């Protein structure tokens, strides 16, 4: 399970993209016909709502760089303005974005993204298109993104995840954000 991701600030509007060096392409390990890619490294994060952040060409260059898993509640200051059952830490909205290039040999394969846990009420976009909303916080979920990504070794794909933890949301400290591992799973169109 290894990954080599292509970091990117902002994508050029209509420029012809240059080929990405082979060693910088997203790579995966194969297990029984399934390629599992660690999708935790090289995300960008913004605490608070960001209008238009789901767009493919949104400029996230001033966002914080981080690796997942991540909890943005624990990074905030304790406050008496929230219920003590939440650990006296605020929730709120946070955005995550990741830019990646898929190698051409992934074209024609099924590609899904699996989240181990996001607390809570997450909305996921790929290349500006709504993939889905998952309102729960403690169970894993996955989306098939095959028809939304480009696998040509050149094109930058973007995944954006909006997380909204409206407190109170539990009777204990819940944290906020993509707090468990994320992986990409690549399979042949016919697989077990």
Predicted feature descriptions by range:
Residues 16, 75-86, 96-98, 103:
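N-terminal accessory segment at the very beginning of proteins
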Residues 32-34, 86-91:
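Short, solvent-exposed beta-strand/turn "edge" segments of beta-rich domains on protein surfaces
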Residues 2-11:
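C-terminal segment of classical bacterial N-terminal signal peptides
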Residues 37, 47-49, 91-192:
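Accessory beta-strand-rich segments of carbohydrate-active enzymes
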């Amino acid at each position: 399970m290894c990954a080599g991701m292509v970091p990117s600030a902002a994508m050029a509007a209509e420029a012809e993209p240059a080929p990405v060096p082979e060693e910088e392409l997203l790579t995966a390990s194969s297990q029984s016909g399934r390629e599992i890619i660690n999708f935790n490294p090289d995300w960008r994060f913004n605490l608070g709502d960001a209008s238009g952040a789901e767009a493919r060409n949104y400029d996230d260059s001033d966002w914080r760089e981080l690796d997942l898993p991540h909890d943005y509640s624990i990074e905030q200051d304790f406050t008496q303005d929230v219920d003590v059952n939440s650990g006296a830490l605020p929730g709120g909205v946070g955005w995550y974005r990741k830019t990646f290039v898929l190698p051409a040999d992934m074209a024609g394969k099924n590609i899904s993204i699996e989240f181990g846990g996001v607390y809570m009420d997450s909305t996921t976009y790929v290349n500006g298109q709504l993939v889905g909303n998952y309102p729960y916080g403690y169970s894993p979920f996955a989306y098939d993104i095959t028809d939304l990504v480009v696998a040509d070794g050149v094109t930058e794909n973007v995944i954006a995840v909006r997380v909204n933890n409206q407190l109170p949301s539990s009777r204990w400290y819940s944290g906020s954000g993509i707090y468990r591992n994320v992986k990409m799973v690549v399979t042949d169109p016919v697989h077990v």
